[in-house]
Regions:
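Cytosolic-side transmembrane helix boundary signature
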Residues: 28-61
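Membrane-interfacial interhelical loops
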Residues: 1-27, 45-49, 74-105
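Soluble catalytic regions of membrane-associated enzymes that act on cell-envelope
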Residues: 75-363
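Short, flexible coil/linker elements and helix-boundary hinge sites characteristic
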Residues: 21-22, 41, 285, 363
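Internal/C-terminal transmembrane anchor helices
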Residues: 51-78
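Generic secondary-structure transition motif, activating predominantly at the C-termini of alpha-helices
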Residues: 3-7, 14-22, 42, 49, ...
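Hydrophobic alpha-helical transmembrane segments
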Residues: 15-17, 38, 68-72
Length: 363
């Protein structure tokens, strides 16, 4: 500032600042002297060609450095880990507005440099006209069954790679003349005595798109919503709505704590308590890791039941299963117990269905 200000006392100010910070002046002079001495030193003449081990060791070091760099960028070396994004800041604060204070400018620029910026959408109707056609807001009348559920516990299951085609109840046409009548016998029996919807529409196609679709009714975009800058915006999600009504909110997933960005988005939507593979292993050890994604669903469902049995009520809990995820393996003791079916996933679906049967029987 003193060099650009329009004044006549710049030299006096410089001398005063130098006197007050004399140790910094000495350090600066010492650095200059060291640079001058080092510059005059004769550099060792490098040989144009070296021995074969020089190049072999150089290639090995380069490959190791590249591998470490990839792991550093991704945040780990497992399939469960994804590179962190803006929404990961919400792991350290429940307030989306404060999350922006945690983020650094260089990181934000790098993560959003390929973003198209503001979302563009077509507006075909004004608000008044649209309200007469369809409104997403529904207000049940007093005395209806919906209002009688106030204060009840809510448990939501998000089942990996499950679809209607696995169920003989939902898609009986697929099993006409087939010896195997579906792969979800327990869930079918549950749906027969439950309030079941037969019309289902996908709001996401990949695991990473599931939570915004299910909790917040946010559809899929070209990029998963949790990886977009807009993910830090306020959303009226189901966990936040129930939290404001006095519910304890929890999210269970047997994968690693930072897997797929689930934990970050869960925090952002009002989830207070996260339970992951690390939490399970603190209680039950690491023997139930499936070797790929996390804890087997049967074991983790039982763990969730243990936690919920001690939980303050009312509570809202979500469980995201993973055993039916690729590469479609089941615990060794269950190999061959469930129908192999026509796809590699069918045996896993049967295994998870049985895990739900045991969970409902015990908890």
């Amino acid at each position: 500032e003193i060099f650009f200000a329009d004044n006549d006392n710049s030299l006096q100010l410089v001398l005063k600042f130098a006197a007050e910070n004399w140790y910094m002046v000495l350090i600066g002079v010492a650095l200059i002297v060291l640079l001058a001495v080092g510059y005059r030193r004769r550099a060792k003449v490098e040989q144009l060609f070296a021995g074969v081990w020089y190049y072999v060791s150089g290639v090995v070091v380069m490959l190791v450095a590249v591998g470490l760099a990839v792991g550093g960028v991704r945040g780990g070396f497992t399939k469960m880990t994804r590179p962190i994004t803006l929404s990961n800041a919400t792991l350290y604060t429940a307030d989306n507005a404060r999350a922006t204070m945690i983020l650094s400018n260089p990181f934000s620029i790098l993560r959003t440099i390929s973003s198209s910026g503001k979302l563009h959408y077509e507006k075909y109707f004004d608000e008044a006209t649209l309200a007469t056609i369809y409104s997403p807001e529904h207000f049940p009348a007093e005395g209806t069954s919906a209002t009688e559920l106030t204060g009840r516990n809510v448990v939501l299951f998000i089942m990996e790679s499950f679809s209607a085609e696995h169920s003989a109840l939902l898609r009986p046409d697929l099993y006409e003349g087939e010896e195997q009548k579906g792969y979800t016998p327990f869930l079918d029996s549950l749906m027969r005595q439950s309030y079941t919807f037969y019309n289902m529409y996908a709001n996401g196609k990949r695991s990473i798109q599931a939570l915004p679709a299910v909790w917040s009714s946010i559809p899929s975009f070209k990029s998963p919503f949790v990886l977009m800058p807009q993910a830090l915006a306020e959303t009226h999600s189901l966990p936040a709505i129930l939290k404001n009504k006095g519910y304890e909110t929890m999210f269970f997933c047997g994968s690693d704590h930072g897997s797929m960005g689930f934990g970050a988005y869960a925090r952002q939507t009002g989830i207070e308590n996260l339970y992951s593979r690390q939490d399970y292993e603190k209680v039950h050890g690491a023997e139930d890791f499936d070797g790929y994604w996390g804890i087997w669903d049967e074991k983790f469902l039982n763990y969730m039941g243990e936690v919920l049995s001690e939980q303050k009520q009312p509570f809202f809990s979500t469980m995201f299963t993973l055993t039916s995820h690729h590469p479609f393996v089941v615990p060794q003791e269950y190999e061959g117990k469930y129908p192999k079916g026509k796809t590699p996933n069918h045996q896993c679906v049967g295994c998870v269905d049985d895990a739900f049967r045991k969970f409902f029987a015990k908890h």
